[in-house]
A protein has these predicted regions:
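A short acidic-to-branched-hydrophobic micro-motif
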Residues: 101-131
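Positively charged n-region of N-terminal signal peptides that target proteins for export
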Residues: 1-4, 8
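Second-shell loop/turn segments in exported
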Residues: 116-124, 150, 223-230
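Short, well-ordered beta-strand elements
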Residues: 207, 215-225
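N-terminal targeting sequences that direct proteins away from the cytosol to non-cytosolic compartments
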Residues: 6, 18-105, 221-248
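Signature of long, low-cysteine stretches enriched in small and polar/charged residues
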Residues: 134-209
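C-terminal motif of bacterial Sec signal peptides marking the signal peptidase cleavage site
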Residues: 14-16
Length: 248
């Protein structure tokens, strides 16, 4: 636009220029004046409109509906969710809030979902932020125990979310991290039989959805040992995402 305005200003200055005025009068006396014909005025070229940036398009996670299953509340003092009551049982006095999948609740390793409220997050989730998160994850102590097989930005309920699939092998660094984050305590480890019991757990598969709920980054992580339970966990997390409220 600035270049167009400068060009129009230069043309108006040139239109006011003339040859020697005395010579013009002489020529006008010798030559009859010709009829004045206005020169056609050229319309300034229009500046092409700037291209409109399109919103990025992400693969969609379809929100599930468990027909015939009622939703029940569960909370941990920080947040409350509504979950499919026929399929899950809340873990009592456990932080973060955890739901056990009923069909595996008596198994040695039970499939479950935990929900955590993280920090206030004013930004929209996007690929750049996901890349930054993945890069930061590599610097965490015990990072070698986590293998990330899928890390994508997807769309859930018309909102961008992070979708991840991981495999974790528990080692001492992971146990230390779980203690630091309040997931485990030394007392819990001792009651279970010591660290070796945890390190003997087979590689743990997980699928996670990170989304923004009421301005906070909220993490839904499903843990499973049998691939047959994976889709059930994903479907449940879509329901939890739409039915989460914060208590503090």
């Amino acid at each position: 636009m600035k270049k167009v305005l400068a060009l129009l200003l230069a043309l108006s200055m040139l239109a006011g220029c003339s040859s020697n005025p005395a010579e013009d009068e002489k020529n006008n006396a010798e030559i009859p004046s010709a009829p004045q014909v206005s020169a056609p005025v050229e319309k300034p070229a229009e500046t092409p409109a700037a291209p409109v940036e399109e919103e990025p398009s992400y693969p969609v996670i379809e929100a599930a509906a468990f027909d015939g299953t009622s939703l029940a509340p569960a909370e941990d003092g920080t947040l409350r969710v509504a979950y499919p009551a026929d399929l899950y049982t809340p873990a009592p006095d456990f932080s973060p809030l955890t739901l056990w999948l009923n069909e595996t609740i008596d198994a040695e390793q039970s499939a479950n979902i935990n929900i955590q409220k993280s920090e206030a997050f004013p930004e929209t989730l996007n690929q750049e932020l996901l890349d930054e998160m993945l890069a930061a994850q590599k610097t965490v102590e015990g990072a070698e125990a986590l293998t990330i097989n899928v890390a994508e930005v997807r769309e859930l309920n018309s909102e961008p979310v992070f979708y991840l699939e991981n495999v974790t092998q528990i080692n001492d660094a992971v146990i230390d991290l779980m203690i630091a984050e309040g997931v485990l305590t030394e007392e819990m480890i001792e009651q279970a039989g010591g660290r070796e019991v945890f390190k003997a757990i087979p590689p743990t598969k997980s699928v996670a959805i990170y989304g923004i709920v009421d301005g906070y980054l909220t993490m839904y992580t499903g843990t499973y040992y049998d691939d047959a339970h994976k889709q059930t966990l994903i479907d449940t997390m879509t329901i939890l995402f739409a039915n989460t409220e914060f208590l503090s």
